């Protein structure tokens, strides 16, 4: 489900971070007052897995699902936003909604609704329907800068560690342990999530005083581990070229 307090309307639930833990529940017991976001996986008989999701989603609101009782699901889409306002340091929130869901040009393609069926969980992982249905990238696209890999990540794993021989939290030392772990296990990257830059002003050039970023970059380079810096749209859009060039030089 969307991570929200009970009692929130659908319009209030449209503003969310799309972060939550999975909930295993019978379709008939889904909370009709809450929205579920995609992908949704259904356990059918004899180990069969059914996944519901979308592909090629551009200029159109993503689909939520809402339980209707029994085995019925209803699709719900956010209306077209009218105006945006800041809501906290990182978030822009819709001020109001129109009575339609999208503005489209003549001939615009709409997203695919995908229902994938697999014999088991392994086959589900191998399914490439979303990729097959997506618009191919331009054949002249330069992909040389894309370097895929696994990451060691602190956001979901929690910073507040106990029983360790270093100061836990968002500071230089724990990130060195993450780098050591990544190097030891063939993990290509670590992610430094929210907190490496000072949050109060959403300024990417105000580094958390407990973090020595240049030291960490040098340390990671020595172990052949890359560092990915998380940044909010609100903070990076102020001067993207300056931010990118500044951190690319490290």
Language model region names:
Residues 105-185, 189:
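An acidic-aromatic substrate-binding cleft motif
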Residues 151-250:
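Substrate-binding cleft of carbohydrate-active enzyme catalytic domains
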Residues 96, 100, 109-111, 142, ...:
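Bulky hydrophobic/aromatic packing residues
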Residues 1-138:
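N-terminal accessory beta-strand-rich subdomains and adjacent acidic, glycine-rich linkers
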């Amino acid at each position: 489900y969307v991570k929200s307090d009970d009692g929130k309307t659908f319009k209030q639930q449209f503003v969310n971070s799309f972060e939550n833990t999975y909930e295993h529940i019978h379709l008939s017991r889904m909370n009709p007052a809450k929205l579920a976001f995609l992908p949704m996986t259904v356990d059918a008989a004899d180990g069969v897995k059914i996944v519901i999701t979308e592909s090629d989603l551009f200029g159109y609101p993503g689909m939520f699902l809402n339980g209707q009782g029994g085995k019925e699901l209803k699709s719900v889409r956010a209306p077209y936003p009218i105006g945006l306002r800041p809501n906290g340091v990182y978030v822009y929130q819709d001020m109001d909604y129109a009575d339609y869901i999208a503005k489209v040009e003549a001939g615009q393609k709409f997203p695919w609704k995908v229902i994938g069926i697999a014999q088991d969980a392994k086959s589900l992982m191998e399914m490439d329907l979303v990729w097959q249905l997506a618009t191919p990238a331009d054949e002249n696209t330069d992909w040389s800068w894309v370097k895929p890999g696994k990451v060691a990540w602190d956001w979901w794993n929690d910073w507040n560690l106990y029983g360790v021989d270093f100061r836990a939290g968002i500071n230089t030392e724990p990130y060195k342990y993450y780098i050591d772990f990544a190097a030891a296990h063939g993990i290509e990257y670590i992610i430094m999530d929210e907190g490496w830059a000072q949050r109060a002003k959403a300024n990417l050039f105000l580094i958390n005083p407990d973090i020595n970023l240049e030291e960490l970059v040098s340390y990671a380079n020595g172990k052949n581990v890359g560092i990915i810096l998380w940044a909010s749209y609100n903070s990076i859009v102020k001067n993207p070229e300056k931010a990118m060039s500044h951190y690319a030089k490290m």
